[in-house]
Amino acid sequence: MTTYGLLIFDGAEELDFVGPWEVFTTSSMLRHHADTVLLLAERTGAIRCSNGMRVLPDHTLDGHPPLDVLLVPGGEGARREMANDVVTGWIRETSASAAWTAGVCTGALLLHEAGPARGHNVATHFAFEDALEARGNVTVVRDARYVVDGNLITSQGVSAGIDMALWLIGHLHGRDHARTVRRYIQYEPAPPYLADEPTADRSGID
């Protein structure tokens, strides 16, 4: 059993955590609901995300079970949370005990501020690569969909978190399982979007 904890906060980019949430919960469902996937926030009550979606956390930062995987999303709220000692301290402490720490988009900046990304190779949203690199003590890997460095995994922006999450469940449960999850959620990142040439993969689910 794997326990995933996805940090949320006001201004978090929705797909940064909803994409991995879909991957993790589908993985659990296909394995007879073997895992626990949780949304965690500093406070109770609705969290208003970057584009207006409101979500409710399952637990607060001081009242959740131990985590195997910690995921930190980006969004404009992530830059604000860099000045929040409660959140950065919690990330630092929780990352130290988790088997995996993950960051999506500008969540890499928050992970750098908190500590786990320092001294590591990381990916982030292309618009923030220079800003992250300027912070020092980090190697920004450009043009990489996601980067694995030790037990830290980071991805580019928004939808890239889905690819990162698929890699992680493939590492934890096997590549065949990850392929089954990808087919189940019908995630087909190639070929690129073509407005006048809709296509669909009609292959069955193994």
Describe each model-derived feature in a short phrase.
Residues 1-101, 108-113, 118, 130, ...:
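Extended, subdomain-level signal for the structured scaffold at the beginning of enzyme domains
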Residues 103-104, 153:
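Short, flexible segments with low predicted structural confidence
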Residues 124-126:
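Class I SAM-dependent methyltransferase SAM-binding "motif I" and its flanking Rossmann-like core
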Residues 151-157:
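A short glycine-threonine-serine/GTX helix/turn-capping micro-motif
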Residues 143-151:
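Glycine/charged-rich beta-loop-alpha catalytic/anionic-binding loops adjacent to active sites
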